[in-house]
């Protein structure tokens, strides 16, 4: 099978053996994988001599299931998430805890965003906001867009902000939510709807160059508000500002509890439902449910899928910052 890797700063397409089925795992014939621009461009830049697999979010068809898998059968369409089990490869061997059924109403292309969706959902959960509270979403790349949409679907008062017009216009077109390009106008609107109190939470979804926003977020927040780091931002929080407002600083790690835990992933042992309500697997299911019920829309984030041979040029385009495209979908059909 073909698999996309990075080595010495270059994209490589290599041949690998199709994985053999094992207990508690599902062998998936890949239909689509979604590129996560920030993560994969960074991995490409940092790659050394050894091949590093790229990708972590996919959809496909279950072709074989191991002993212990009860919720999926061969022939089912599935969405799956999480490196090293999920990558830009023609076949994937995925633990049952990281594989969910795709309902009839959801396309396989949409479902290939499941990993990015789980990350967005976990970021929102980290903030522990309640409906009616005010959430500023700064940075409308793919994660900011998804967080803003899901927050809006959860009846939060969302104030989206991005300093480039195309991404702001895209979010406003999809959601109908007033979106801001100018920081000053966003601050005026925040002051208006919060009656001068500030936001309950600020989601920082921009890239490393937007580190200044960590301090800015504290100005936007109410007393004891929450600043949540989602993007690859280098934090620069001023202690006096933190102290003055008793700001809560949070960071969101991937798709939720279970990520990078060998017991949950490699051994495919789920956490007890009553103690860990929202694992990464259950966040995946929730993202698919939101798609199924048309509570969020990801169709406008995707253009025609690309071929596996076009990945290098696609990453170059994304790295150059094409503001109209937030991701690329690779087709294996």
Spell out what each predicted region is.
Residues 25, 32, 57-59, 76-77, ...:
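Residue-level marker of beta-strand positions
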Residues 19-34, 43-84:
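Glycine-rich beta-strand-centered segment in the early N-terminal region that forms part
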Residues 196, 285-305, 312-333:
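C-terminal capping/lid region of NAD(P)-dependent oxidoreductase domains
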Residues 109-184:
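Mid-domain Rossmann-like dinucleotide-binding core that forms the NAD(H)/NADP(H) cofactor-binding site
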Residues 239-301:
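C-terminal substrate-binding/catalytic core of Rossmann-like NAD(P)-dependent dehydrogenases/reductases
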Residues 178-252, 258:
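Glycine-rich cofactor phosphate-binding loops and adjacent beta1-alpha1 units
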Residues 82-95:
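A structural motif shared across PLP-dependent enzymes of the aminotransferase-like
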């Amino acid at each position: 099978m073909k698999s996309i890797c990075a080595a010495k700063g270059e994209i490589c397409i290599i041949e690998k053996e199709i994985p053999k089925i094992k207990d508690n795992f599902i062998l998936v014939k890949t239909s689509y994988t979604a590129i996560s621009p920030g993560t994969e461009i960074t991995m490409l830049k940092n790659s050394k001599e050894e091949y590093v697999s790229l990708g972590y979010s996919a959809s496909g068809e279950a072709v074989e299931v191991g002993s212990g898998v009860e919720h999926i059968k061969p022939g089912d369409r599935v969405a799956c998430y999480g490196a090293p089990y999920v990558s830009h490869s023609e076949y994937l061997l995925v633990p049952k805890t990281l594989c969910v059924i795709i309902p009839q109403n959801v396309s396989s292309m949409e479902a290939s965003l499941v990993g990015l969706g789980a990350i967005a959902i976990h970021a929102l959960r980290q903030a522990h906001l309640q409906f009616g509270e005010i959430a500023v979403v700064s940075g409308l790349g793919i994660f900011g867009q998804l967080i803003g949409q899901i927050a809006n679907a959860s009846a939060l008062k969302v104030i989206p902000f991005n300093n480039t017009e195309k991404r702001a216009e895209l979010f406003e077109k999809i959601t109908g939510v007033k979106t801001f390009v100018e920081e000053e106008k966003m601050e005026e609107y925040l002051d208006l709807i919060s009656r001068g109190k500030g936001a309950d939470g600020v989601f920082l979804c921009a890239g490393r160059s937007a580190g200044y926003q960590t301090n800015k977020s504290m100005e936007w927040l109410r007393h004891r508000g929450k600043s949540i780091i989602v993007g690859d931002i280098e934090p620069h929080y001023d202690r006096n500002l933190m102290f003055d407002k008793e700001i809560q600083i949070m960071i969101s790690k991937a798709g939720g509890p279970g990520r990078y835990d060998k017991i949950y992933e490699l051994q495919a042992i789920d956490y007890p439902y009553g103690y860990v309500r929202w694992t990464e697997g259950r966040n995946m299911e929730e993202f698919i449910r939101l798609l199924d019920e048309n509570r969020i829309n990801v169709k406008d984030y995707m253009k025609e899928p690309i071929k596996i041979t076009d990945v290098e040029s696609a990453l170059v385009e994304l790295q150059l910052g094409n503001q109209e495209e937030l991701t690329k979908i690779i087709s294996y059909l």
